[in-house]
Amino acid sequence: MSPSANFSHFLLIILALLKGFPYLKGIESANVVAENYSIRVASQSSARVHEDEKETRISEALNPVLVLDNTVTVRELLKEDPFSQWTYRSRWSELSDLELTSDSMSKAIQAGKASRLKRVLLKALAGKKINVVIVGGSNSAGGKLGVDERSLDGLYFNVFTKWWNETIAKATNAFVKEYGVTIGGTGSYVFAFCYKTFIPRDLDIDIVLIEASINFNIRGKAEPLEQLTRQVLSYPSAPAVFYINLVSGLGLDPTTQKVINPLCTNLENFRQAELAHHYGISSFSLKEVLCRKKDEGWEAAVTNLAGSDGRHIGIKAHAQVAMMIIEHVRGVFKEVINDVTNNVNANEIASLALPELFFLKSKTEALSDPLCWTGLTPNVYQSRQRSNLKLDVIESKGFYRKGGSKTGQYSDGNNKTDLRTDAQGGWTAWNDHSILKLRILVPPLNSRTIPESRSVIVVAHTSGYGGEAKLWLDDNKDRAIYVDSKANFGNNLLNTVATRVDPGYHVVTVQTLRWGMFMVSGLFVGPPDFNRREVL
């Protein structure tokens, strides 16, 4: 085969790997491009095709020579020991330093389908920027690292992206940019409704890290995570998705000096692994490292890697998770390089179609074009939330708008930021008989298979000094729901006010019933039959 034929064959392999690749903005479907290019090569035509502009755009999006050069360089990088590359090489230089073994690592890294990640890594070989979104709770927002380490550099995703930028990116120029959507006391449902409103419009997301194994409750179990997963997987750029499965409370309670969570309970107790398998998600389980199986359950085995509060994970546990992600990405990267260098065509082209529902019982409960207004924020220093719900306050008696203070508050209500930027916020009242009326526009649900009506949901923030309120829609006071926001921990719980709501303008009324803080931290519009109470 001539050199020119080899080059043409190589380009076809790259295009085949990129079939359906949504990152190539400004060009037609990569599938069509690959077919058109294949026809031209097969015909051996010397005539120039009158599509110079399209071919220019293709070359701008994908430079095969650059991909080949970067493949050679990255292959050599992947031969090196990752412990010699990462930021902790002088502190933890081998698995045993992290209290890990090859066996525990293999159990902790639970690989899913790699096709989406492979396309991201091929994009990196082409020198394109990689966008990573982190969705999670207080551990991802910083936990106690700011207090214990005086820095948030040790967050698991920061360690991973620093490794990437100092190794892969230096060779390819494919630097990672992070977008944090991390808020303490917040579970998967809030993120399923709202995560898009916290990132730039039309952002090409490449990888999403979902840390949701701690912030859940028994009412919802893993169903909220399924809703979030479906929302992320259906994002236009078809990102690769990882579950970051942490465990809270593996330290000692400062008062009792006993392990707070001795049974290592997290969302993995409630069929999260089955959910990951159903959707082909790769998971990284801290439970497999810090806990051990006993009879039919689990028990805490390593209790010295928690933060100073005994609840959040400490810096070494963050490092363990980071190394899991690094090892997984390295392994898949080696497969991609083998595919490219050996001219192996990609037989598995990732389908963007979602599989059937798993925990959800009906499509009329599954989120589709959800609308979100929220006073929560992952960063009090940036006004990033782009509410997609039209909302007006038409009456406020005793309620005031509480936003996150820059000198601020922790998400759990403490008055010290500890370098964290996440904060609670919303419409807040302390006195009884306070009234809040919010006028919202409920648009029709554009679907051929389910009704165009919607559901209306209020998010209330719980606290140890929480109040109580009744909530209703329009004039339906006789159908009011009652929400008690007093709880041991500060969480953001969803409560459906009404289902099968016709399109148009509607008014949500909140009336407090006793003294205490009642905070409306969010207002959502969901699918017709989304009827949930006190889910996280």
Annotated model-derived regions:
Residues 87, 339-449, 529-536:
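Glycan-recognition and processing domains
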Residues 133, 280, 299-360:
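Histidine-centered active-site loop/cap adjacent to the catalytic His
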Residues 96-100, 139, 145, 177-196, ...:
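Cell-envelope and extracellular/periplasmic
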Residues 85-180, 194-204, 450, 456-472, ...:
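Serine-esterase "nucleophile elbow" of acetyl-processing enzymes
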Residues 503-505, 513-536:
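Exposed low-complexity, polar/acidic, P/S/T/G-rich flexible segments that act as propeptides
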